[in-house]
Amino acid sequence: TRTIPQGLSAMLAFDADLSLEENRLNMTKAFDRVSTGQITFAARDSEYDGHSIREGEVLALDNGKLSFIEHDIVKACVKLTRSLVHRDSSFITILYGADATEEQANQVKGQLDARYNGEIEVSVINGGQPVYYFIISVE
């Protein structure tokens, strides 16, 4: 796996009663269904992939690639999550980090709940991770 949400999804698919090959197939299928988003900040001024980035700006990463720059972490998280959702999505998990508040995470959840109106289950977890305000998993 390449991301934390993919690793978590693969771990949840593990079944000790299955063979190595069956587990490999199930775990691979599980992590292949996961799209990952990350909301972080620019540590310094830079240029990246055609984007002019200023220190402190909020960066939205779509499966590891810079998607857009924002100034508000809640807006960035909602916008990025919406871009990760596809027709078959069923679950959204938002892990909020050490530099995001539970209130901000619940604002994200509220906006996504309103947008998807129960069609997609939205969960918020205090991940406590450094560097990333939010890590987003869409399955």
Labelled PLM ranges:
Residues 1-139:
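N-terminal loops that bind phosphate or other acidic moieties
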